[in-house]
């Protein structure tokens, strides 16, 4: 899980979702998991 000010899709499997007011990137590649913080 990377914590970043700006979350971006890194590949075509990445999805940007908002959970409980937190922007996250979910992906089949665990290295691409991000959250805004």
From Swiss-Prot:
The keyword Ribonucleoprotein applies. Transmembrane segments: none annotated. One of its GO terms (biological process) is translation. One of its GO terms (cellular component) is ribonucleoprotein complex. GO terms for molecular function: structural constituent of ribosome. InterPro entries: Ribosomal_bL36 (IPR000473), Ribosomal_bL36_sp (IPR035977). Keywords: Ribonucleoprotein, Ribosomal protein. It holds the Pfam family Ribosomal_L36. PANTHER family: 50S RIBOSOMAL PROTEIN L36, CHLOROPLASTIC (PTHR42888), LARGE RIBOSOMAL SUBUNIT PROTEIN BL36C (PTHR42888:SF1). Belongs to the bacterial ribosomal protein bL36 family. NCBIfam families: rpmJ_bact. This is Large ribosomal subunit protein bL36A. The gene is rpmJ1.
């Amino acid at each position: 899980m990377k914590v970043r000010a700006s979350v971006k899709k890194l590949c075509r499997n990445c999805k940007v979702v908002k959970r409980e007011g937190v922007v996250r990137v979910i992906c089949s590649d665990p290295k691409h998991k991000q959250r805004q913080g």
